[in-house]
């Protein structure tokens, strides 16, 4: 393929995730972005109490029942504005804290992120965790302060909190005029324009209650009354006291442009989307153990950042989500699966619009494709046109909670093993088989995961399982010479298990036991996290 065409296609890609604390409005914003992008027909009330439809990105049965996002959905849509023609890849991540591991891995597959802040609650615990994950990779962040149609905290106070708590500079790009019942719109600092808000006018794309050019325009006083003068004072203060936007600082992950709006009313969403495609980076280079992979290389490379079982329960399928890192994917191309050394023909890769899928004819760096997986593809696997690359930075965490699986019907043991194995391959839970028993022990980073697994076992595999507490306080992967690990198994084999990848894990009954065991076996590394490579 000519370099210019490859370059053109890659340069129009934007791949980002939305991060927030639960209930900040992330799912609503996701749906409104899809609506502005033309990917869905209506932007209705997402998960409203009486609504019969569910958010486009919350497709799993349990998510529909509970109203929280528990898996990362991937959605692709085209978007065109005055600046050009773009392909947007939006990764919706779980907001609930028990799903941080899945979110962490999803953030390895994006080039930028939108952070949603609730104007009523400000910076919350999960936002802090997720921003710290983005900071590890210097991911550029855009901030959307949501729910301006409610009585919230003062905008200047919110910016101060973001800067102090999250340690990132804020550069306001829009500024709200009032809030709650007196919310009248936003002022665009970059082009000196007031965009007026009227909830009745915001039902069509591009519709607005009106635009007024210039802060000194007398029309502003006529429309806003006393709020016009308040706005002028606010803007003078903001221009003097806050940071002006610096693209280099933004791309380095040190400054975030800030937009205000009300996602539920479609207000401010299009400005955010325009900023996202205009300011965010095109696909970035990715690190491997041997070299950096540049997106414009002509040979295809990609890595698996997520595995999802039963995206379509009718087909009992498993899909490996692959981030394309370089070159172009073509349907039917033969690729090396680096971990197995085998070459596979990828004939039926798919692209996503939440649960709607289409067969992928081609994809470029920045895109996410789904590769059907029959149990041979693992998290972190690399696919290339022959080069034995291993991408770095895809983490797996030691679980903090443990349960033993028990069946109500012992005849379903085979289905239980298969279900737990497949669900563990997704990486949100981990399955351990203790060497000293036939137990199946499940580990997770949060207790909600066990409810999710029990529900999915019943709904997707027809298995009724109970999860009982297990006498394990923490887990550590074992790394060392085979003879040293054999000695540990000889002395403390009752606490050693094998994980889904066949690696040895020490299941410590207490922190004291772990410390004493580490002292007794100083030549073995007891690892809390490890990279999936």
Curated annotation (Swiss-Prot):
Q: Does the keyword Chaperone apply?
A: no
Its annotated compartments are:
Cytoplasm
Chain residues that bind GTP: 20-27, 92-96, 146-149
What GO molecular functions are on record for this protein?
GTP binding; GTPase activity; translation release factor activity, codon nonspecific; translation release factor activity, codon specific
- Which residue intervals define the domain tr-type G in the entry? 11-284
Instruction: List the CDD domains hit by this protein, alphabetically.
Output: RF3 (cd04169), RF3_II (cd03689), RF3_III (cd16259)
| Tagged with keyword DNA damage | no
* GO BP annotations, alphabetical order: regulation of translational termination
Q: What is the predominant subcellular site recorded for this chain?
A: cytoplasm
Gene3D superfamilies recorded for this chain? P-loop containing nucleotide triphosphate hydrolases, Peptide chain release factor 3, domain III
InterPro entries, per the entry: EF-G-like_DII, EFG_III/V, G_TR_CS, P-loop_NTPase, PrfC, RF3_C, RF3_dom_3_sf, RF3_GTP-bd
Functional summary from the UniProt entry: Increases the formation of ribosomal termination complexes and stimulates activities of RF-1 and RF-2. It binds guanine nucleotides and has strong preference for UGA stop codons. It may interact directly with the ribosome. The stimulation of RF-1 and RF-2 is significantly reduced by GTP and GDP, but not by GMP.
Q: Which family does it belong to?
A: Belongs to the TRAFAC class translation factor GTPase superfamily. Classic translation factor GTPase family. PrfC subfamily.
- What's the name of the protein? Peptide chain release factor 3
């Amino acid at each position: 393929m000519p370099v210019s065409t490859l370059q053109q296609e890659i340069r129009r890609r934007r791949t980002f995730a939305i991060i927030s604390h639960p209930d900040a409005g992330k799912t609503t914003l996701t749906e409104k972005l899809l609506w502005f992008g033309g990917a869905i027909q209506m932007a209705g009330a997402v998960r409203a109490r009486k609504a019969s439809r569910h958010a486009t990105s919350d497709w799993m049965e349990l998510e529909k029942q509970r109203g929280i996002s528990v898996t990362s959905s991937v959605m692709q849509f085209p978007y065109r504005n005055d600046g050009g023609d773009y392909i947007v890849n939006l990764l919706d991540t779980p907001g609930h804290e028990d799903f941080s591991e899945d979110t962490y891995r999803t953030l390895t597959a994006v080039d930028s992120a939108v952070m949603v802040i609730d104007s009523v609650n400000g910076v919350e615990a999960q936002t802090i965790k997720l921003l710290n994950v983005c900071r590890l990779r210097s991911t550029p962040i855009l901030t959307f302060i949501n729910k301006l149609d409610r009585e919230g905290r003062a905008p200047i106070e919110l910016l101060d909190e973001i800067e102090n708590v999250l340690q990132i500079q804020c550069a306001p790009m829009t500024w709200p005029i009032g809030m709650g019942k007196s919310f009248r719109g936003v002022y665009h600092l970059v082009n000196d324009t007031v965009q007026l808000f009227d909830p009745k006018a915001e039902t069509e794309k591009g519709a607005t209650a009106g635009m007024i050019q210039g802060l000194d325009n007398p029309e502003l006083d006529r429309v806003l009354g006393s709020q016009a003068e308040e706005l002028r004072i606010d803007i003078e203060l903001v221009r003097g006291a806050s940071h002006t936007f610096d693209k280099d600082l933004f791309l380095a992950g040190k400054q975030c442009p800030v937009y205000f709006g009300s996602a539920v009313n479609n207000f401010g969403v299009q400005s955010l989307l325009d900023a996202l495609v205009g300011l965010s980076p095109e696909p970035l280079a990715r690190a491997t153990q041997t070299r950096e992979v540049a997106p414009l290389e002509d040979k295809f490379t990609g890595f698996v950042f997520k595995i999802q079982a039963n995206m379509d329960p009718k087909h009992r399928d498993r899909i490996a989500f692959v981030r394309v890192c370089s070159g172009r994917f073509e349907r039917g191309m033969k690729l090396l699966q680096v971990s197995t050394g085998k070459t596979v023909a990828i004939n039926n890769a798919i692209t996503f619009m939440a649960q709607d899928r289409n067969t992928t004819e081609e994809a470029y760096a920045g895109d996410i494709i789904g590769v059907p997986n029959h149990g041979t593809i693992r998290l972190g696997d690399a696919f290339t046109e022959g080069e034995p690359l291993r991408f770095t930075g895809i983490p797996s965490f030691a679980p903090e909670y443990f349960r033993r699986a028990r069946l109500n019907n012992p005849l379903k043991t085979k289905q239980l093993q298969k279900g737990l194995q497949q669900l563990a391959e997704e990486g949100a839970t981990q399955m351990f088989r203790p060497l000293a028993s036939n137990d199946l022990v499940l580990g997770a980073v949060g207790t909600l995961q066990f409810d999710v697994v029990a529900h999915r076992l019943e709904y997707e595999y027809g298995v009724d399982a109970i999860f009982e507490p297990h006498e394990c306080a923490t887990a550590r992967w074992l790394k060392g010479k085979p003879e040293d690990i054999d000695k540990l198994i000889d002395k403390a084999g009752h606490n050693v298990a094998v994980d889904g990848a066949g690696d040895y894990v020490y299941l410590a009954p207490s922190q004291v036991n772990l410390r004493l065991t580490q002292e007794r076996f100083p030549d073995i590394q007891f690892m809390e996290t490890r990279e999936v490579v």
